A protein has these predicted regions:
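Flexible, acidic/Gly-rich N-terminal and inter-domain linker regions that tether
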Residues: 6-65, 70-73, 216, 221, ...
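Hydrophobic alpha-helical membrane-insertion segments
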Residues: 1-4
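Conserved Radical SAM active-site core
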Residues: 35-46, 58-61, 65-144
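Conserved AdoMet/S-adenosylmethionine-binding subsite of the radical SAM
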Residues: 112-233
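Acidic-enriched, low-complexity/disordered segments with a strong bias for Aspartate over Glutamate
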Residues: 6, 68, 75, 91, ...
Length: 233
């Protein structure tokens, strides 16, 4: 009977120890996420780039979870909550990426919510080219061979992001977006590639306007989401 009476006490200690270890693991993960050695990985896949300057080229995409920019027309809203995606070590991400391509595109979500230094340093140490797709709303981190900036009205890019941009990709959802695009174009370097891309759900309405605009303003280039037409990721 004495041994049996100790069972509840034993289980209480097990629960208490489990709680302590769980809290320690959460704290450890938090520090690793902050350091960038762990990232909330939504998905990763090898495909053909569908948009902008590198469309038609093969690349391995790393989609990082987490975004608070909040575009109402976002086609990957499931990426917004970083807690919905498994924390994955940068070493594991790099090891898998190396099997597929020497061109890596980091996208989101908003990847610059996280420290990109460990990821890009690891990728580049293995000879891979690093591209990023970002709103530019967060401080820059990482080493990038190509920087695609896509500003959003509700959370504008930093000055550093405008200075770094190799490509400016403006999403056109309505007529007002043309003037917003021109405002953003004034902030990038003269050699930055300028793209106008219709928001997918408005493409039939906005594409004729974009074509006319580009024909009158030839510094701009039409960008299509060709991967959606090809039915690939």
């Amino acid at each position: 009977l004495g041994a049996l009476s100790n069972i509840p006490f034993f289980y209480l200690w097990i629960v208490k120890l489990w709680t302590i270890f769980a809290k320690m693991e959460i704290k450890k993960q938090g520090k690793m996420l902050e350091a960038g050695t762990l990232l909330p990985l939504m998905e990763a896949f090898y495909t053909i780039q569908g948009e902008g300057y590198h469309k038609g080229s093969a690349a391995y995409f790393i989609r990082v979870g987490g975004c608070d920019v909040g575009c109402h027309w976002c086609d990957v809203k499931e990426s917004w909550n970083p807690n919905s995606h498994p924390p994955t070590t940068v070493d594991e991400i790099i090891k898998t990426a190396h099997k597929y391509s020497d061109t890596i595109v980091v996208t989101g979500g908003e990847p610059l919510m996280w420290n990109m230094e460990p990821l890009t340093e690891g990728l580049k140490s293995m000879g891979m080219k690093t591209h990023i797709e970002t709103s530019g709303a967060y401080p820059l981190s990482g080493h990038w061979d190509w920087f695609c900036l896509s500003p959003k009205k509700n959370k504008l890019p930093t000055a550093e992001a405008f200075d770094r941009a190799d490509e400016l990709k403006m999403i056109i959802h309505n007529r007002d977006d043309f003037s917003f695009a021109e405002q953003q174009a004034q902030k990038v370097a003269p050699n930055c590639k300028l793209y106008l891309q219709p928001e997918w759900s408005k493409r039939e309405k906005m594409m004729p306007l974009i074509v006319d605009y580009v024909m009158e303003n030839t510094q701009w280039i039409v960008s299509l989401q060709t991967h959606k037409y090809l039915n690939i990721p």
